[in-house]
Amino acid sequence: MKAKVLLSLILLCGGLAAPVARAGDATPAASPAPAACELPSYLLTSESQLPKVADAVKAGKPLDILVVGSRSTTIPSSESSSYPARMEANLKEKLPASEAVHVSVEIQSKKTAEETASTFVKLMEAKTPTLVIWQTGTVDAIRSIDPDEFRSAVTDGVAALQKAGADVVLMNLQYSPRTETMISAQPFLDNMRVVAQEHDIPLFDRFAIMRQWNDQGQFDLFSPSRGPELAKQVHDCLGRALAQFVIDAAHLEPAQQQN
């Protein structure tokens, strides 16, 4: 049963395996946001800030973003449609043309928060991102990891990333109406919010965002019939939302954004 839940969750957001990088697989430019991507402003705001992102943009330094997550970070055979790529495209569109933006992905397939956090010291020695977006919680919920142990692992992971000099955004679980009665997500959602508050870092509430889209009829996340096409649309909207979330959390002035 647990394996089926994991499979359903991964299929929902579009990835059973990371796509193979191909030369010339360029990220398409950002287009006007479709109506399906609309969200209430409270889901895209945070009282916590991203000072290192702000400093990099103000100084005209490259903005390197590392997304650490599971296979749901990607879409098979369509890397340019995944939410990290769509975030990059939207940041490039919104930030000054002179600002170099690069988003890379570190896949931690089927790993708990504790297992992922244990890799952060070496990972941050090999990379020097301005911002790390850590997508976590789904595997822990599926495996019914003790919520207190989960919170401790997320705390340790955030501390390691901050010690290495990066801003951090936590991204919580994905929402699926097909599996919400099969796993207990709330303890993990609550603990991620607590850790974010304790460390004064932004929490990108992917769970609430996807539930909003489903409840308002913008996306039918219950039906599996549209598969890859639905995944691309959801990823596009997530990428747009993340880009705006990062810009707002960095408190960039209008002069530091494209008009």
Regions found by a protein language model. Give the residues of each.
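Bacterial N-terminal signal peptides
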Residues: 8-17
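Signal peptide processing junction and immediate N-terminal pro/mature segment
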Residues: 17-28
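Serine-esterase "nucleophile elbow" of acetyl-processing enzymes
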Residues: 32-105, 122-128
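Cell-envelope and extracellular/periplasmic
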Residues: 33-40, 105-111, 133-143, 197
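Oxyanion-hole/transition-state-stabilizing segment in secreted/luminal serine hydrolases
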Residues: 53-54, 66-68, 73, 96-98, ...
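Structural recognition of the beta-strand scaffold that forms the well-ordered cores
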Residues: 64-69, 102-107, 130-136, 167-172, ...
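Active-site segments of SGNH/GDSL-like serine hydrolases
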Residues: 135-138, 158-189
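Catalytic His-Asp segment of secreted/periplasmic serine-dependent ester chemistry enzymes
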Residues: 175-259
